[in-house]
From Swiss-Prot:
It comes from the Eukaryota. The use of alternative transcription starts causes dual targeting of the same mature MDAR protein to both mitochondria and chloroplast. SUPFAM superfamilies: FAD/NAD(P)-binding domain (SSF51905). It catalyses: 2 monodehydro-L-ascorbate radical + NADH + H(+) = 2 L-ascorbate + NAD(+); 2,4,6-trinitrotoluene + NADH = 2,4,6-trinitrotoluene radical + e(-) + NAD(+). Redox regulation of the activity by thioredoxin TRXy1. This is Monodehydroascorbate reductase, chloroplastic/mitochondrial. It comes from Arabidopsis thaliana (Mouse-ear cress). FAD binds at residues 68-71, 95, 102, 107, 201-202, 351, 369, 398. Catalyzes the conversion of monodehydroascorbate (MDA) to ascorbate, oxidizing NADH in the process. Mediates phytotoxicity of 2,4,6-trinitrotoluene (TNT), an explosive and environmental pollutant, by reducing TNT and forming a nitro radical that spontaneously reacts with atmospheric oxygen, generating reactive superoxide. Can also use 1-chloro-2,4-dinitrobenzene (CDNB) as substrate, but not 1-chloro-4-nitrobenzene (CNB). Its EC number is 1.6.5.4. NADP(+) binds at residues 226-230, 254, 313, 367-368, 398. The main mechanism for TNT toxicity in plants is the production of superoxide in the mitochondria by MDAR5 with TNT as a substrate. Inactivation of MDAR5 enhance TNT tolerance, thus enabling revegetation and remediation of explosives-contaminated sites. GO terms for cellular component: chloroplast; chloroplast stroma; mitochondrion; nucleus; stromule.
Length: 493
């Protein structure tokens, strides 16, 4: 098996399609067996740690957030809402920007200039969650110190001290780790480092890709997940020869049923996108100018490309925090229902946190903006107040593609719940489509494309309540609207 095949296979097989929460990370055995007693959700939040007086004049900080993504921005807002930010909170980020809504980077940020692309400061947090736009000036006005372009390189938990790349030392009272993930990369020896090969996690990554798109003619996107789908849709707006390559048999295998995948694949083909499915990549080839020029497959065939985007998953950005308790089965830093690690005074939120998924009684790690926002808010409320309710997250996934001006069909789907059990599909892009997952007679998950605001609001109610539904009656529905009415009636019975 080639090195790339191993990387791509790992990215796909570590997220199984049959055992629940297949969108994000594998589920682990029940919490009762896996969750140690020391992670009790009720108890002292400060334990034996020492309190640190806030003073930006010296190196002490009462609260420090490491990371500058969605979770950091929403955590900062929650500190402000509780009157605990001014002169007390410090955010340390490796990026040059204040926290922003990261999903934009593979959506509107990639639109060509004539399609009105998104740009900062337009999508700073917390606009994606309906909140105020937190520009750099907002942090200054709220008395929040932000240290830009200086990532944390070391941590001494006994001394409650962080050291940055530049050598700056920060002493903290409470530490919130919100470092997110890093993109999985192709090894350098097979061309993963070549000019014209792109990975997207930050604004700088997206800017580099846009520079390539402006000159590109042929683009190959490696990975059939939602990142690959979003980048491919953006490439269509640039009028590029676009090919998606992935090892699975269908698009977005972790969520879509084969029938649903077939419908979306046809939609992409109508927009000129080509698919190479079940493919293993041997290496990326360089042209005479040193830039990527082709993607060579394991079967010996090649696909010409002057731009390649790798979207094969991500890994928790553990960095200097590897000595904290980790969850070895699903990755990430182990936390309890209040996002406390086993080390007093240290919390982890967002993509990097392995937490108890209360609704399904298992541990998980979720790489999604919705969880980043909600985990940040829950963690800070628990840290600052007497709030002791454990986090009760309902898995949620969405994507929006082809939303630029002139697109014949704008696509927006939402999913809530657990994609397990049998499925019922209703509709045929007329203009809607819905898929229901049913296990032991109960509705476990539901996906709707092009729903109304009222229909989208119904989905989490259905997924959380898991009502008993008549599968045959759902299957006989003549429209998505009728199917949702049947499900809603089951909810109310």
């Amino acid at each position: 098996m080639s090195a790339v095949r191993r990387v791509m296979a790992l990215a796909s097989t570590t997220l199984p399609t049959k055992s629940g929460l297949s969108l994000w990370c594998p589920s682990s055995p029940s919490l009762a067996r896996r969750f140690p007693a020391r992670f009790s959700p009720i108890g002292s939040r400060i334990a034996s740690r020492s309190l640190v007086t806030a003073s930006f004049a010296n190196e002490n900080r009462e609260f420090v957030i490491v990371g500058g993504g969605n979770a950091a921005g929403y955590a900062a807002r929650t500190f402000v809402e509780n009157g605990m930010a001014d002169g007390r909170l410090c955010i340390v980020t490796k990026e040059a920007y204040a926290p922003y809504e990261r999903p934009a980077l593979t959506k509107a940020y990639l639109f060509p200039p004539e399609k009105k692309p998104a740009r900062l400061p337009g999508f700073h947090t917390c606009v994606g969650g309906g909140g105020e736009r937190q520009t750099p000036d907002w942090y200054k006005e709220k008395g929040i110190e932000v240290i830009y372009e200086d990532p944390v390189a070391g941590a001494d938990f006994e001394k409650q001290t962080l050291t940055t790349d530049a050598g700056k030392q920060l002493k903290y009272g409470s530490l919130i780790i919100a470092t997110g993930c890093t993109a999985s990369r192709f090894p350098d020896k097979i061309g993963g480092h070549l000019p014209g090969v792109h990975y997207i996690r930050e604004v700088a990554d997206a800017d580099s890709l846009i520079a390539s798109l402006g000159k590109a003619k042929k683009i190959v996107i490696v990975g059939g997940g939602y990142i690959g789908m979003e980048v491919a849709a953006a490439a269509v707006a640039w009028n590029l020869d676009t090919t998606i390559v992935f090892p699975e048999d269908q698009l977005l295998q972790r969520l879509f049923t084969p029938s649903l995948a077939q419908k979306y694949e046809e939609l992409y083909r109508q927009n000129g996108v080509k698919f190479v499915k079940g493919a293993s990549i041997n290496n990326l080839e360089a042209g005479s100018d040193g830039r990527v020029s082709a993607v060579k497959l394991a079967d010996g065939s090649t696909i010409e490309a002057d731009t390649v985007v790798i979207g094969i998953g991500a890994k928790p950005a553990i960095g200097p925090f590897e000595t904290l308790a980790m969850n070895k089965s699903i990755g990430g830093i182990q936390v309890d229902g209040l996002f406390r690690t086993s080390t007093p005074g240290i919390f982890a939120i967002g993509d990097v946190a392995a937490f108890p998924l209360k609704i399904y009684d298992r541990m998980t790690r979720v790489e999604h903006v919705d969880h980043a926002r909600r985990s940040a808010q829950h963690c800070v409320k628990s840290l600052l107040t007497a709030h002791t309710d454990t986090y009760d997250y309902l898995p949620y996934f969405y994507s929006r593609v082809f939303e630029y001006e002139g697109s014949p069909r704008k696509v927006w789907w939402q999913f809530f719940g657990d994609n397990v059990g049998e499925t019922v599909e209703v509709g045929n892009f007329d203009p809607k489509i819905a898929t229901f997952w049913i296990e032991s007679g109960r509705l476990k998950g539901v996906l709707v494309e092009s729903g109304s605001p009222e229909e989208f609001q119904l989905l989490p109610k259905l997924a959380r309540s898991q009502p008993l539904v008549d599968k045959a009656k759902l299957a006989s529905a003549s429209s998505v609207e009728e199917a949702l009415e049947i499900a809603q009636a089951a909810l109310q019975s």
